[in-house]
Amino acid sequence: IKEMPLVEPFPVKTLKQIIAQIFKLYKTTETSIMLDRLKDLGFKYSTVSGATVSTHDVATSSSKPEIIANAKKTVDKINKQYSRGLITEEERYESVINVWYKAKDQVQAELQEIADKSLTNPIFMMMKSGARGKISQFVQLSGMRGLMSKPGGRVIEIPVISSFKEGLSVSEFFLSTHSARKGSADTALNTA
């Protein structure tokens, strides 16, 4: 390994493979020494890099307003079909949920493209390395939160369109915390 050229960053998956190979080839003692050195290198270069995160690093979707507008039009058409008796309540509900899932997926796809192209953005570096965060969390940060669930597990058909960067309205904040409050209450009751 010492003589091998470093041609790309080491994501967590690659590091796991390297550690597994070293563990197979050497004893536990040598592996633990290597891991200590690897940890020290990680601390050293993460400090030297000076990577910081600011709100300017949070890329946003330029086509999100258009995606949301199209989704709202589609939901209006679905609701008109229901009011005319062309579809059942369950069909209406499922269709509306699917429209909002697709809208969030479109926003996520655009943000994934931005992430794939960005080599120096610290948020994307952490995400790509596997150190912190996933694309779904980044979508909530800069795209849209999407659909939330009721405490019983049923999905609320009104989406949280705003992202954390944009800021949530009072109603969106309430929707976002709906099932979290139930989870906290259940935990408190179970531990009491």
Give, region by region, the residue ranges found by the protein language model.
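Gly/Pro-rich turn-and-neighbor structural signature
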Residues: 90-142
